[in-house]
Amino acid sequence: VQENDLLISITADLGRTGIVTKEIAEHGAYINQHLTCIRLKQDKLNPLYVAYYMESDAGKEQFIAKNQSAVKAGLNFNAINSLKLMVPPLSLQNEFAAFVERVDQQKQTVQQSLEKLELMKKALMQEYFG
């Protein structure tokens, strides 16, 4: 795989996405039959924008509609190739992706703060009540 490749789960957890990071690409990685790799034209599509779109309700609905089996989830090449994508100008995609990254970073910071507070609370509870 290469940096910024879009990976999509095509079995089991249908439609989950991921972006190949520089670190992963530099160390070398391979995918198996449970993933598909899409190499986007980055002058037209921001990989992070596409990943978030695919995980949105609109994207998930497409995966559900194209699922080929009621027993075991799965998509083939034709199903993946027929997925529709709303494509705003690249500048808006980049703006959206940057905003979502900032929000995700802030969420992570808040989550870490909550975990620290919970540890402090437990320590105080232990100290006061044994």
Q: Across the structure, where does each feature detected by a protein language model lie?
A:
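Generic alpha-helical structural context detector
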Residues: 9, 36, 51-55, 126
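A structural micro-motif recognizing beta-strand termini
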Residues: 22, 40-41
